[in-house]
Amino acid sequence: EIEGELAGTNTSCPYHPSHFRNQECTFCYCPFYPCEDPDLGEVAESPRLGRIWDCTHCNFIHRKDVASYVHGRLRASGISGPGDPALEELFRETKTKFHRKGKAVMILGATSDAGKSVIATAICRILNDRGYSVTPFKSQNMSLNSRVTHKGHEISMIQDLQARAAGVSRPSFRINPILMKPKGDGMSQVVLEGVPAGDYSSADYYSEFVPGPGTDALKRSIDFLQSRYDFVVMEGAGSPAEINIYDSDIANMRAAEAADADCILVVNVEW
């Protein structure tokens, strides 16, 4: 890989896209693995290998500017193998130069069914087609339609569809950290970060869950996604102006504030 030229996007590879559709494929394996940088990965448990460094959702070395810079610096420095101590210094240098927080945009709706999901999906596809790494995000979704990720976590079906539009080959629970599944009689099962967390009434959800685990999960997911993607396309829920839950609404403006997102309001002209 060091001796060859920049590979570009190798669509003929049977594993493409391993990260996002327009990824730079020069480095099939990251020369910095395991970097153990919390901005780019996390420790995970492997059934076969025990504790490993998991960077499934790290796109850093597959960005064209990063791959080009690292390729040139590896050649110039004479680094030829993974054990070279100069790799650690090159990693720090590269991260300082290129790592940046992803830009967030929030799609809000004047009402439910205004078209937020369709607009968010379209923006994901447009940004992906332009060569950016992009991910969808919806902090809180109420739906009985869900999908299971490759790691066994449950997320809403629409976020899974948006991930496909964004070119994300392996979506994680981070794109939908809170999934509410209505059970009737005012109760919902809450799936937190892909795992069932209990049944809540509407009152208990907003008074007990949202201020603690709900807000914490929202911030963890936003930090995770913004550290790994160029763009985070966020989708709100219902209307951002429901005054009865405004102070405890983590699906709309509070999520937008946490991500410092620009907001687009979708309005159904029939209303």
Label each region the model flagged:
Residues 1-97:
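Cysteine-centered metal-binding/redox modules
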Residues 93-271:
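Flexible phosphate-sensing "switch/lid" loops adjacent to ATP/NTP-binding sites
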